Amino acid sequence: MLKKRSRSKQALMAETNQSQNQKQSKTTPFPRLFTAFSSFKSFTENDAVASPTSILDTKPFSVLKNPFGSDNPKTQEPETRLKLEPKRIGLAIVDSLIQDETPEPGPRSGTILFGSQLRIRVPDSPISSSDFGIKTRNSQPETKKPGSESGLGSPRIISGYFPASDMELSEDYTCVTCHGPNPRTIHIFDNCIVESQPGVVFFRSSDPVNESDSDYSPPDSFLSCCCNCKKSLGPRDDIFMYRGDRAFCSSECRSIEMMMSEENDTK
């Protein structure tokens, strides 16, 4: 009896083991096929990432995507609009520049006035100096007509009166100041020498002056004697000049005169 029971238990255990093995085989069919497929898939992914097959391939990670999913790209309308906007702005700027560079209808004519072509309108000689300032306050320069004079470099004579304040503001005005015991100031306006008086100037030509104009040219006898010791100077004597209008017999006399003139200038 005991032997029969043990045999029946062994038979039941064997049947249960067979049924469990059959269930496991049904749940995991072809295990080797799946392991091979997974290893092949990982190898292809690594190979595709490391070395792309084409230069034009813009999707290096396309292998990692779901092969069964839909690869339809999304709509890119806002991106295309953003890309087109800079081009439109650039074309608008170019159009505006072209419109600015277009010449305006009608010729443009301009006149250029040089300093030597200006002339001052000088009124008639006034009766008093007070009337002169009132009349010449609103005077305006006139333009010279092209053919009114023979040439630009020719000396000209201006007759009349002119305020010194207006003359000093002109570009054609030059002032020469001479220092010494007899200081004087020479005003030159354009091509003319000016004779000055308080507040009013008189014009005269810059031609060589006559002997009677002793104020602006040294006398003919200034080389006949020394300005310091009054020694007479002959044609064969050495003459030492100072400031162009003073002659001396020696360098000592000239140095004395120079020291005296410097002392007078400092006072």
From Swiss-Prot:
One of its GO terms (biological process) is response to glucose. A zinc finger (FLZ-type) spans 221-265. Induction: Down-regulated in response to mild as well as prolonged energy depletion. Up-regulated by glucose and sucrose. Residues 15-28, 126-141 have a biased composition (Polar residues). Signal peptide: none annotated. Residues 1-29, 124-156 are annotated as: Disordered. Keywords: Metal-binding, Zinc, Zinc-finger. InterPro entries: FLZ8/MARD1 (IPR044593), Zf-FLZ_dom (IPR007650). GO terms for molecular function: zinc ion binding. Belongs to the FLZ family. Interacts with KIN10 and KIN11 via its FLZ-type zinc finger domain. Interacts with KINB1, KINB2, KINB3 and SNF4 via its N-terminal part. Interacts with HB21/ZHD3. May act as an adapter to facilitate the interaction of SnRK1 complex with effector proteins, conferring tissue- and stimulus-type specific differences in the SnRK1 regulation pathway. PANTHER family: FCS-LIKE ZINC FINGER 8. This is FCS-Like Zinc finger 8. The gene is FLZ8.
